Amino acid sequence: MSHPALTQLRALRYFKEIPALDSQLLDWLLLEDSMTKRFEQQGKTVSVTMIREGFVEQNEIPEELPLLPKESRYWLREILLCADGEPWLAGRTVVPVSTLSGPELALQKLGKTPLGRYLFTSSTLTRDFIEIGRDAGLWGRRSRLRLSGKPLLLTELFLPASPLY
């Protein structure tokens, strides 16, 4: 199963450098804290609509593959992050199977828990980079994060109802 927002997320084209944009836009796109928390600060109840979750092979993650270790399988999670039931963000997380050891096994068991609620409670979370992307008037970003030094890639597309616009 797929969703049009995930198709658009995969079509994002990334800037080589951070573009000169309005400071309010950059505040959203370069946020280092949890997007879930930011949405909740808007006075909204945040929920997850699951689109797809499970193991995939390299051929299903061509956009992410150059940014992650080459492995036989990856855990893929595609969701819509909703505020008061309205989709504000499409998210795609790709986790190499080698990352799924120890406490990070919990990444497979998030269910309808927003990823940010898990990631940003970890004292071992670091971020390698944030890249800003755009497609058909919508903004997005991707980040390679690390838990205990182990990588995962998170891509987010801000949907039209998001307060980013």
Curated annotation (Swiss-Prot):
Entry keyword annotation includes Cytoplasm: yes
Biochemical pathway: Cofactor biosynthesis; ubiquinone biosynthesis
Gene3D superfamilies per record: Chorismate lyase-like
Reactions catalysed, as given in the entry: chorismate = 4-hydroxybenzoate + pyruvate
SUPFAM superfamilies: Chorismate lyase-like (SSF64288)
Top-level enzyme category: lyase
Record-listed E.C. numbers: 4.1.3.40
InterPro entries found in the cross-reference section: Chorismate--pyruvate_lyase (IPR007440), Chorismate_lyase_/UTRA_dom_sf (IPR028978)
Subcellular location: Cytoplasm
Record keywords: Cytoplasm, Lyase, Pyruvate, Ubiquinone biosynthesis
A cellular component term, taken from the record's GO annotations: cytosol
Signal sequence residues: none
Major place of residence: cytoplasm
UniProt keyword annotation of Disulfide bond present: no
Subunit structure comment from the entry: Monomer.
The protein's name: Chorismate pyruvate-lyase
